[in-house]
Every structure is written in C-alpha cells, then in structure tokens.
C-alpha cells in the first residue's frame, strides 16, 4: 500500500488532477441535472422571448423606447453566458465576471421597466412584464454567483445538483497549500529504528584501508574480543523487544457528508460514505481529513464532501 505522501499514491494523483474526475467540455447534462440552473435559465429565456415579442409589437404601434432594444441584446448575451458557464462547469472561474455583467444588466432592465410599465398600451405592458421577469432572474443570479461557495443558501442549492462538487473547503480555517500534508492513520508504515552512536560502535573500523573491523585480514585484531561486524556484544545490540506504541488519534470534530463518496479501490487509505452520514474528524486543516465512520472504520475523506457541524 503506498504511503500517503508518496508520489505513487492514487489519492495524491487525484488531488493533483482535482477532486474526482470531472468531465470537460460543454454538456447540457449539467444544466438538466441542476434544478436551480434549469429553472432560472428556463425562466430567463421565457422572459426574454416575452420581452422580445412584445417589443416588436410595441414598436409597430410606435413610441417604443430605443434604449429597450439594447437591453434585449445585452440580456441575450448574459443569459447565453450563464448557460455556457453552467454547461461547461466554469461557474467558479467566471463568477466575478458573471456578477459584473448581470449587475449592469439589472440597471438596463429596470430602466426599461420604468419606461414601459406606465403606458396604457397592452403591448407596452407585456414588454414591461418581460423586463420585470428578467430583472427578477438577474437579482437571483447576482445573489447566487456573488456569494461564497460555502454560503448556506448556495450549499443548499448545490446539494440538489447531480454534477456539482462541493466547495474546496467547508470550514473557516485556512486550507493547507501542500498536497502532501495528508493525515497519518494507523495504516501508515512504522518509522525506521534509530540507533545511538554507542550502539553503532561495533560497525567502526580501525583501519582506513581495509573494510574489516580490527584491521586487515590476518591481523591480530581480527582474533581479538572486539565486537565484529554482525557480531556485536549483547550490550551493544539494539533491543527490538519493545514494540512501537500505536498512536492514538482523537476525533474532536464532527462533520456531515453533503455528497456521497466512493473510495478509490486502488487506495486502501480512503473510506466510502453516503450523503448525510455523520463522521468524526481528527484534523480539519488539510484537503484530506482523517475521519472515522460510526461503525469504527477509519481512513481519509476529501474535505469538499464534508461540512463541519
């Protein structure tokens, strides 16, 4: 079994490549599997169509503000941008840009509503209704993308998504930047025995030329009572009667699984758990936490699948 910090550890390779094996490229399955994204994008598209069709009819009647056309164009690209980032799983990368563009779009939609809502003409009122829906969806998106991934409302919304992973850290403590700082468990290899200089006296040579203790071959020193290589006296032989004491690990923290996790079959250090399972955790400073399941099974678990209680 590879050690936790070894280069060949499967979990270390997993950390280097990111949490889990996330598929790349554009996929509509990410939108379909995310109820929040599916609902908001669908309502946003419907609101844009209502505003667009009503704007055309209003322009035929005359008196339609030209500013509202720019609002339609701008919101079209905003909705398309949100759709592409969700389908490409790039929300965390572009969430700042998304919030910036949506904030500008909110100004445009509310200004268009103010220009249309007071008109007694039915097409103008229908267009105003479409812009109001666009404003509401924009507010929801700004509140979602403008919040940290560990925010309670965002964690709740993301828990229903099939293809989303949890945030990098679910605790307020800083995350360690070192990928090799993985917690030690009872499965870790026993450290090598250390010897003192007194115990190693028998390995010293009296001649810098020959490699034999007591001098070169045939010398009198070889027949002396000095300890020979591999034949040290009992007083100089390191004792191995004492077995290394097993390190007891305390689990002062409790964490709840917000996602199900299947352990890597190639890494015996990992443990599997189901969503909503309660685990005991020993340390929360790294990206992999030493955890213990209710049945007593111990191992490591990715911190982005857990939230501290």
Curated annotation (Swiss-Prot):
Residues 169-190 have a biased composition (Polar residues). InterPro entries: SH3-like_dom_sf, SH3_domain, Sho1_SH3. Residues 164-190, 205-244 are annotated as: Disordered. GO terms for cellular component: plasma membrane. SUPFAM superfamilies: SH3-domain. Residues 58-66, 117-125 are extracellular. Its main location: membrane. Belongs to the SHO1 family. This is High osmolarity signaling protein sho1. It comes from Pyrenophora teres f. teres (strain 0-1). The lineage of its organism: Eukaryota, Fungi, Dikarya, Ascomycota, Pezizomycotina.
